A protein has these predicted regions:
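A basic, Ser/Thr-enriched alpha-helical scaffold prevalent
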Residues: 1-377
Length: 377
């Protein structure tokens, strides 16, 4: 059975390799408008369109690797109607096939919501007909309900009492599209869970994934409310250092992208050091370098190693080999150079680096001693 698991790990690497798909520095923008529109904590917004940077193949590869695919978490029990567990007896070949299918399903479930620029509402005036002025005191809305059109392609216009014919504002378009062509799970009116005090209660209880999943259903990625809500959730996760709540979920990639875009990665880097995810730490630095220019120069061999697809963490981690421990020392040196040059929490990070280096040196000496005892060269 263990042989099957070892072969499955190789299969995982092949699947990962076959399915992997310069932005200048920006200014932090603050607003006092909350997702519910009632005012609240300030949030960070994207000054420029983040879409081109987010969609880059190398950025997507880095974000997927940072997400860390873990089958136990992806396929954990959820609060749904049908949550039964099925047990089957399988041969070794059937188990290999099932593992490959599970990895493919997990990668589909971890597909990241896109990060795009917030849409600006522009209501173009189609015409002004003075002859219709004072014909009625009410507004008339005309909607093209032709079957097969996308919601953003549908013509919706408003006739005002003064005779002006104008394109409908986005909120009205969204409401009418939901009335004529309802999307499952989306409501016409904003749910109270996106407003205080309910939103704050959900954040304090750590229901980050639940809030973000509901936000993906209720809003489009280009809506201003979606940007405000996700920014607030991301900031709360970062301040609470609850990174494991989003790790190995479809929201971890956009979350890391948000932190890297706004240069708020020190707490995440500290968490990566504590959890011995050094490769992810270097990937985070490479992501920063990609978004903000050459933050840190990496040699070609190191960069090629980082951009090489990594095997998903499907099973419990075993003791690292000597080669892996030596590679971790190289990763740690890269992280230390970044911390000394660009870190904002240098004291905490340097202490974590020092503690990790001492422990890693002990493990490396122990591994080399065991190898010498076994007479291996």
């Amino acid at each position: 059975m263990w042989k099957v698991f070892q072969e499955a790990r190789l299969i995982c690497g092949l699947v990962r390799a076959n399915t992997v798909t310069g932005v200048p520095a920006v200014t932090r923008l603050f607003s006092s408008t909350s997702a519910g529109g009632d005012g609240g904590e300030p949030f960070l917004a994207y000054e420029k369109d983040p879409g081109p940077a987010f969609m880059r193949e190398d950025v997507q590869q880095l974000l997927k690797s940072l997400t860390r695919l873990e089958l136990d978490k992806v396929f954990r029990k959820r609060s749904v109607k049908d949550n039964t567990v099925e047990y089957r007896f399988m041969t070794d070949d059937q188990l290999r096939q099932e593992l490959v299918q599970s990895i493919n399903r997990a990668q589909q479930m971890l597909q990241m919501p896109p990060v795009v620029q917030a849409q600006q509402d522009s209501c173009r005036i189609v015409s002004k007909d003075g002859a219709l002025k004072a014909l009625s005191t009410a507004k008339f809305v005309f909607t093209d309900i032709t079957y097969g059109l996308k919601n953003n392609q549908r013509s919706i216009v408003v006739r005002h009492p003064d005779g002006t014919l104008q394109e409908a504002p986005y909120e009205m378009r969204k409401r009418l599209n939901q009335i004529y062509f309802p999307l499952n799970g989306r409501s016409i009116h904003t749910s109270p869970m996106f407003q205080d005090p309910y939103l704050q209660q959900l954040l304090e209880s750590g229901r980050y994934e639940f809030v973000l999943d509901r936000a993906c259903v209720q809003y489009e990625p280009y809506e201003q409310e979606y940007h405000q809500l996700t920014a607030r959730v991301y900031q709360h996760v970062n301040e609470s250092r609850a990174f494991d709540a989003l790790r190995s979920t479809r929201h971890f990639g956009p979350f890391v992208f948000f932190l890297a875009w706004h240069r708020l990665v020190d707490d995440l880097l500290l968490d990566i050091l504590k959890k011995d995810y050094l490769r992810n730490g270097v990937e985070l630095i490479v992501l920063l370098s990609t978004l903000h220019g050459n933050e840190l120069q990496l040699d070609a061999e190191m960069k090629a190693l980082i951009l090489e697809p990594e095997m998903p963490a499907l099973f419990e981690t075993q003791e690292k080999s000597i080669e892996q421990l030596e590679q971790d020392q190289q990763f740690l040196a890269v992280i230390e150079r970044y911390v000394n040059a660009h870190g904002t929490k240098k004291v905490q990070l340097n202490l974590a680096i020092q503690a990790y280096r001492e422990l890693a040196n002990e493990k490396l000496e122990l591994a080399r001693g065991i190898k010498r005892m076994h007479g291996e060269s």
